[in-house]
C-alpha cells in the first residue's frame, strides 16, 4: 500500500476529487482508501501550541476541542504516525483525546516538568518522568474544576490559574 499527501482542489462528485499531489503517491493512480487530515477549513485548526520533550504540541480545533496532537520527536511539522515494518516507533507522532466523564474544551497547554493541560472542566498532566512515546503517553486527571480562559502564570515553580 502506498501512502501520500494531496491537496484537494475540487470535488467532482461523491466519489471523485481533483488533487495536487504533495508527496508520496504517483499521478494517475486512483485510490478508494483516503482520509481527511485532522485540520482543515471544515474541522478547524489548532488554537493552542507549545513545545514539550522535543515535540511540537497543538490542541483544540473547532471539531475536536478536546484533542492534543504531538509531532514526531524533533520533526516539528510531521504529525504522521509513520510505521517501520508494521510497528510504531518511539518517535512517532501522538494523538490524544482528553476526555473523562464529559468532554471539555482544552484552554491551555503549559510545559513544565509535566505537560499541564487545563480544560473548561478539569485539569490534566502528561507525566514527564520518562520520555513520552506513543506506548507510554498517559493522561492523568488532577481535579474536576476547570480553568478560565485567562492566561496561567508561574509564581516560582508553581503554575497559578483561575478556576472555572
Regions found by a protein language model. Name each.
Residues 12, 23-25:
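Residues that cap or initiate secondary-structure elements
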Amino acid at each position: 500500500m502506498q501512502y501520500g499527501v494531496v491537496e484537494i482542489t475540487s470535488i467532482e462528485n461523491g466519489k471523485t476529487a481533483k488533487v495536487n499531489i504533495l508527496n508520496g503517491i504517483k499521478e494517475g493512480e486512483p485510490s478508494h482508501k483516503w482520509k481527511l487530515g485532522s485540520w482543515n477549513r471544515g474541522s478547524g485548526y489548532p488554537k493552542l501550541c507549545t513545545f514539550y520533550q522535543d515535540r511540537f504540541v497543538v490542541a483544540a480545533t473547532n471539531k475536536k476541542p478536546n484533542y492534543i496532537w504531538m509531532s514526531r520527536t524533533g520533526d516539528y511539522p510531521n504529525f504522521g504516525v509513520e510505521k517501520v515494518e508494521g510497528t510504531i516507533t518511539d518517535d512517532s507522532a501522538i494523538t490524544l483525546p482528553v476526555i473523562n466523564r464529559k468532554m471539555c474544551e482544552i484552554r491551555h497547554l503549559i510545559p513544565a516538568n509535566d505537560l499541564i493541560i487545563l480544560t473548561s472542566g478539569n485539569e490534566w498532566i502528561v507525566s514527564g518522568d520518562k520520555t513520552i512515546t506513543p506506548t507510554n503517553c498517559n493522561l492523568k486527571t488532577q481535579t474536576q474544576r476547570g480553568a478560565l480562559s485567562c492566561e496561567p502564570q508561574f509564581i516560582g515553580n508553581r503554575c497559578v490559574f483561575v478556576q472555572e
